[in-house]
């Protein structure tokens, strides 16, 4: 009986959040270990479908780095990286697009539909969803002078036409986006999935942006999880070394989304089953919330 009462209390804790977020949109970046573990894949699918059933629109943006690496290796293509970004020549871009749109996207869509959802897969090229420009990197040469480096078909989002997403949401569908964009000449670009999620969330004026990661969230210098960060505190946390390394671009993605009109952003440990529900529908949450 006690377990039943605990379940009822959990539902009651979620009720005010369900009321608050019903009819709103949440954009979720799906990547990392959550895409590889079968139990986590199932809990992710069930979380997303439950959100849709209770009236919360969800838009999924997925990654696919490990799958790309595996396929490139099979084709004998060796990748080079500049400041953590893959140099993407024409041959590499062909593989990247094939894997993200033809393999990973369809797997995510299939898994959601298998568990009762109505997911529709698309890339940024569909309906002109993601218009891109070439992303150039600045690196220091041997003399310590900054040089601009062309890293190929790697793009940055300059415009999001969210009309196709609004149409899909209105029809009861769950959009699943592969992070491939299109240039003004029709060329394909590979885009960082976190960036795509943030840009899409801003375009939709989403209630929340959630980044599923392989870490518990942002930690202080003592290793303790920071459950909440104010937007205005982020620059100082980067400057004092609290936010470092690969967490900087994720937090920057969140702050850009907040500046663009998203209400809250969350960095959540995707290795925890039902991480999305735990972050949204509990008073404490499990990750780091960033708010304006």
UniProtKB/Swiss-Prot annotation:
Its main location: cytoplasm. The keyword Transferase applies. Substrate binds at residues 64-65, 86, 190. It is found in: Cytoplasm. Keywords: Amino-acid biosynthesis, Arginine biosynthesis, ATP-binding, Cytoplasm, Kinase, Nucleotide-binding, Transferase. GO terms for molecular function: acetylglutamate kinase activity; ATP binding. It comes from the Bacteria. Coiled coil: none annotated. It catalyses: N-acetyl-L-glutamate + ATP = N-acetyl-L-glutamyl 5-phosphate + ADP. GO terms for cellular component: cytoplasm. Its EC number is 2.7.2.8. Pfam families: AA_kinase. One of its GO terms (biological process) is L-arginine biosynthetic process. Pathway: Amino-acid biosynthesis; L-arginine biosynthesis; N(2)-acetyl-L-ornithine from L-glutamate: step 2/4. The record marks 29, 250 as: Transition state stabilizer. HAMAP family: ArgB (MF_00082). Catalyzes the ATP-dependent phosphorylation of N-acetyl-L-glutamate. PANTHER family: N-ACETYLGLUTAMATE SYNTHASE, N-ACETYLGLUTAMATE SYNTHASE, MITOCHONDRIAL. Belongs to the acetylglutamate kinase family. ArgB subfamily. This is Acetylglutamate kinase. It comes from Geotalea daltonii (strain DSM 22248 / JCM 15807 / FRC-32) (Geobacter daltonii). The gene is argB.
């Amino acid at each position: 009986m006690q377990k039943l009462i605990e379940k009822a209390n959990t539902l009651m804790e979620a009720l005010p959040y369900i009321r608050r977020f019903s009819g709103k949109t949440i954009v979720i970046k799906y990547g990392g270990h959550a895409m590889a573990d079968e139990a986590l894949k199932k809990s992710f699918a069930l979380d997303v479908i439950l959100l849709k059933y209770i009236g919360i629109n969800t838009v999924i943006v997925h990654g696919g780095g490990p799958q790309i690496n595996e396929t490139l290796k099979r084709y004998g293509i060796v990748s080079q990286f500049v400041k953590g970004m893959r140099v993407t020549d024409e041959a590499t871009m062909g593989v990247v697009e094939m894997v993200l749109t033809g393999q990973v996207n369809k797997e995510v869509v299939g898994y959601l539909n298998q568990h009762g959802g109505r997911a529709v897969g698309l890339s940024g090229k569909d309906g002109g969803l993601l218009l891109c420009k070439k992303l150039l990197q600045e690196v220091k040469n041997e003399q310590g002078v900054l040089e601009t480096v062309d890293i190929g078909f790697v793009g940055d989002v300059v415009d999001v036409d969210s009309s196709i997403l609004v149409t899909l949401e209105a029809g009861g569908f769950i959009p699943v986006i592969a992070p491939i964009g299109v240039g003004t000449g029709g060329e394909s670009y590979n885009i960082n999935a976190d960036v795509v999620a943030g840009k899409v969330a801003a375009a939709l004026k989403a209630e929340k942006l959630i980044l599923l990661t392989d870490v518990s969230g942002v930690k202080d210098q003592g290793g303790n999880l920071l459950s909440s960060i104010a937007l205005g505190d982020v620059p100082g946390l980067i400057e004092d070394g609290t936010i470092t390394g690969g967490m900087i671009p994720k937090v920057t993605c969140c702050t850009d989304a907040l500046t663009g009109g998203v209400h809250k952003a969350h960095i959540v440990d995707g290795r925890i089953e039902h991480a999305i529900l735990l972050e949204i529908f509990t008073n404490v949450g499990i990750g780091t919330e960033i708010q304006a």
